[in-house]
Amino acid sequence: MRILLANPRGFCAGVDRAISIVERALAIYGAPIYVRHEVVHNRFVVNDLRERGAVFIEEISEVPDGAILIFSAHGVSQAVRAEAKARHLTMLFDATCPLVTKVHMEVARASRRGTEAILIGHAGHPEVEGTMGQYSNPQGGMYLVESPQDVWQLQVKDEQNLCFMTQTTLSVDDTSEVIDALRARFPAIVGPRKDDICYATTNRQEAVRSLAVQADVVLVVGSKNSSNSNRLAELARRAGRAAYLIDSASDIDDAWLSGVGCVGVTAGASAPDVLVREVIDRLQALGGAAAQEIQGREENIVFEVPRELRIEVQQAD
């Protein structure tokens, strides 16, 4: 059985930065460090940080006075940010992915102008909640759509003063269909100058398409609440391949590999490489050959952590 690895796969720059912020805060200030929402959507990462002293909460009211608080990579609404700043916290660090912040700024600009804004995204996802929460102009409006059907049912105040933006972790193909519907329904609508779906999401989706051409079965390492990981599994299935979203090697069912000549492995942007290595080990124990990595896009983007954490770590060293 051949084992093919998607390239790129796993951690993106935003996830690397978010995890590093929590790790550095723990190293400098010690436990507990409070984090609003799971810093990234991966069970292994969250459990590891929890064991090291991170406390994951959903409400700012759960954070005691004098504590250190970190916002997750998914971002928060202006209301949550204001609530946190009103508290007597020792330090407040923002681990919001800079590419999510870009979308936040687009929404905030629309709000200031009074332009109605339409967000393409998944209802209930923390990134969507944070992005929707950047709009505060009662004279305008902020709307959420997930499908072309939502677009055709949407009613706005002024069809001549509209813009749209997207969640960063969506399916590129699905989003394109929604954008086409928006442009057909509202010809005057204005989109972002640069796509909001992030480079890592796009690259990993391209890689899984290439993987699905060669593999009989695709394993996606990622947690069930990871939007980008779910999209990878969906893409593989649309390509006609059996695809399974797994948290770890222990989730692999031997029956999935019965009669399989080639298995493809990829990982969502919040899944650490250690989990991929464990999956490879399991596949090789089941008769797999040495893993081969397919060609793909090189990624060299790095997002810096907040200056306070860089300075303090340097001083500690």
Swiss-Prot record:
Enzyme active site: 127 (proton donor)
Pathway per its UniProt entry is: Isoprenoid biosynthesis; dimethylallyl diphosphate biosynthesis; dimethylallyl diphosphate from (2E)-4-hydroxy-3-methylbutenyl diphosphate: step 1/1; Isoprenoid biosynthesis; isopentenyl diphosphate biosynthesis via DXP pathway; isopentenyl diphosphate from 1-deoxy-D-xylulose 5-phosphate: step 6/6
Q: Which UniProt keywords apply?
A: 4Fe-4S, Iron, Iron-sulfur, Isoprene biosynthesis, Metal-binding, Oxidoreductase
The EC designation for this entry is 1.17.7.4
Q: Where is (2E)-4-hydroxy-3-methylbut-2-enyl diphosphate annotated to bind?
A: 41, 74, 125, 168, 226-228, 270
Family the entry assigns: Belongs to the IspH family.
Q: What is this protein called?
A: 4-hydroxy-3-methylbut-2-enyl diphosphate reductase
Originating species: Edwardsiella ictaluri (strain 93-146)
Primary gene name: ispH
